[in-house]
Amino acid sequence: MVALVSDLRRRYSRFWPWLLCLVISWPGLSVAQSEADETAAKTALIFAFAKFVEWPAEAFTESEADFTIGVIDDPAMYGALLPLAQKRMHGHGIRIVAASVTDDDFTYHMLYCSRAALEELMETHADRLHARHVLTIGEDTGFAENGGVLRLMLIDDHLGFVINSTAAQRAGLSLSSSLYHLAHSVLEESP
């Protein structure tokens, strides 16, 4: 099974960077487009992000465990991500969960949330976020600067993103060099 996943990853490794570029630069992502189109584009980008991130083996409690995406307080994004539950990620089924900052069990691989939710999580559950290798994604100004791994943003009427490489390292995540090359900017926190 591992050999098959490695073979598929190697075979299609050239394809995913181009798909990510296409999603980011898609002309239909202008500000004038409907919110539903923008949410669909963000969903595609979130799915593409996961292809470019490597989680440590201990991020999956069991070999058959689901790849879990949590969404805090954003019903539109939760609904947009639900169709991903029919797909697979890194050999795992995908599960979409309506999450909360009060959750005690952080079994998420990706967590989409606001800056306010992230700040609350960092105050109360920072150790769990890092120990569970959670890739945090948000859109608010200052999201990456406040410890989020990826911030989605509109840049010249196109969807782009910022990476906080220190937050990714703290979470034990390995981001592909393709992500770094496509990022609008890369932040590194001071020690």
Explain the meaning of each model-derived region.
Residues V2-C21, S25-P191:
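Short hydrophobic alpha-helices and adjacent helix-cap/hinge residues
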